[in-house]
Amino acid sequence: YRADCITDMALEFFDQYDGKKPFFMTISQIEPHHQNDRGHYEGPEGSKEKYKNFVLPHDLEMLQGNAAEEYPDYLGQCASLDKNLGRLVERLKKEGLYDNTVIIFASDHGSHFKTRNTDSHLNGYDDYKRTCHDGALHVPLVIAGGPYKGGAAVKELVSTESLPKTILALAGVDVGDAMIGENLLDVAEKKTDN
C-alpha cells in the first residue's frame, strides 16, 4: 500500500543516520485522499469489509454525496496512516531518538465526499478546499514532543502558515515579525493575544 511504501523509504534514513547532527524529516503521505485519476478512495485491501459497519458522521449522512460508498475505504486509509505513524514512533524509540524529537502531524484539508461545491468554473472539480465548510477549516494539526507536552487542545483557529515560524523556533531561531504566522507554542501556552 502506498502509505507503507512511503514510510518504508522514510525509515531507511535511520539505517545510515549516525546521530551526530540533528535531523529534519518531512514525510508527505497522500492518504486519506481520493485517487485523483479514479475519483474515489482506495483503502488498503479489506477496508470495505472491515469498516463497512461504521456509522457515517451526521453531517455526511444527511447530505447527498458518495460518503456511504467511500467511507469504509477512507477509514482504511486513516487506519493505514495511524499504523505507519506508529512504525515511525517505534523506530525513533528503538534508535533512542524519540524523547528528543518533535513530531508535527498536519493536513491541508479534509473531505466532504462530494456533498457540496462542484462548480462549473472548475470543470466539475470540487471547490471544497477553498470554502468555509468544516472539511476545509477543521483539519488535523498535532504537535508532540520537545516543549509540546501535556496534551493541551487549542480551541482557537490556527493556520499551517505558522508552521515554518514554529519549526524555526524549535531550532532556536527567532524570526520575530519577519515571517507571517505565530510560534504555535506561544498559542498553546496562551502567551499571545492573536
Q: What does each of the following model-derived ranges do?
A:
Residues 2, 29-34, 109-112, 148-149, ...:
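Short, solvent-exposed loop/turn segments at secondary-structure junctions
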Residues 3-57, 93-102:
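Active-site regions of oxyanion-processing enzymes, predominantly non-cytosolic
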Residues 4-8, 72, 76-86, 136-137, ...:
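A structural signal for well-ordered alpha-helical segments within the folded catalytic domains
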Residues 23-29, 77-81, 85-88, 102-108, ...:
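Beta-strand elements within well-structured catalytic alpha/beta cores of enzymes
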Residues 37-46, 93-152, 159:
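Histidine-centered active-site microenvironments of extracellular/periplasmic hydrolases
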Residues 44-69, 124-127:
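Aromatic- and acidic-residue-enriched carbohydrate-binding clefts of CAZyme catalytic domains
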Residues 64-78, 126-129, 147-158, 171-175:
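Active-site rim elements
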Residues 111-122, 149, 162-164, 169-194:
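C-terminal cap/loop subdomain of S1 sulfatases and analogous C-terminal strand-loop tails that border
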